[in-house]
Amino acid sequence: MKTILGISAFYHDSAASILVDGKIIAAAQEERFTRKKHDSNYPFYAIEFVLKFAKIRLRDVDQIIFFEKPFLKFDRLLETYVAFAPKGFKSFAKAMPIWLKEKLFQKNLLFNELKKHDENFIDIKKIYFSEHHLSHAASAFFPSPFE
């Protein structure tokens, strides 16, 4: 049995899903638990829900997939700011400290948050990052009738 926990967080509409042998067992958006529309925080309650629904402990999950690669997003962000410079400089100046301090190093952030679900979760190597646009494509393709 192969289990995958999918996580979307820190942008908008945080959510979690769990797949077992390629089949979606449960999925939930964090806003359903926090009642905060478009909640961007770490989806603690959504993860708790999908794990409980699937009757799986976090330590037993084979892979944890985050919806995007932080360095690719940072690269896109820089390209956008350069393309529109000097417009948007205030936004750029505000965003950079957050990116340089936290967002580029999300693997450690995710690991620390995941430990809140299961203190025995110790394998940071289970955390992977997918390309954002491939995540969108996969969410459309895999449940479709196409092979």
Give residue ranges: language-model regions:
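Short acidic/glycine-rich loops and adjacent helix/strand connectors
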Residues: M1-E147
